């Protein structure tokens, strides 16, 4: 059975974070179980976009600093990095490192920031959907990867945690291409699992001290959550996190895909080492992107199901909408859209919904939270959503 450790940590006070993180890791055998002096360790943090730590969009720098210090105490060499949404360019990375606090972490600890923006093609024979793809060159050069994710809801995948965090080893706009290639959520989930399996992080850590609910992964609301989660198995870690957030594992494409491949166990088969006295359950507000599930109810009647499917795709699917009062015409959404379904109409984004693949990358990268998801109220009448 896989083990997941949860420890309470009320805030980002340095002593609280470092002590809690060290205790969590010791419950799994300590960092020395995986790391030796001289090892080059890549900390794959979540740096989705250039947001300050208080917005809970990215892995908090205090957790990254504590982990870096623990690694350096063992004699490891540490490099911090991610390939955020959008172009993978030095100027963009400099801004993101500064805003997210990673520049400060590097200065205070002596860790390196990843400035190697090159990528290498890899062949992964065990991939279910992905065998040939590109990864950051810095990932290949590291001895070990440690996965340092953020607990958040996600408009496309319901939650983003340890497994999806590894998507960031794929450089820049290559990620957008993958969205367009795998428009079905479960197929996309398999691709995420392929990348996670290739990366094989030695340990996965989740920043759940402050989390995000609602319109995640970037436009949601901050939740004071007070916990750090650690596991050697990213799938078990995500299962526990999904249970805590009130999300059914099978509604998370990465977990459903992992289950289909026998990589993921049920919560009952996870060994849970927790300091929480009242259990782990807590319901998060979920994204408004859930699609109607009544097709499954009527699926036994092909003709009826076909009619409902056509109606659903045209009239009942959630869709991104722009708030013109918040939009600054920065064109981030236009640049990122993998389906090229956005036009700049008088410099304000306009959506061609017949082309939109509902990946919600546009909402994800919008710096002003100007894109929201419209979800027809009539969906509630059908008694359920995915």
Residue spans of the language-model regions?
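Extended, alpha-helix-rich binding/interface surfaces that flank or overlap catalytic cores
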Residues: 357-358
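N-terminal and secondary-structure boundary signal
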Residues: 1-328, 334-339, 343-348, 353, ...
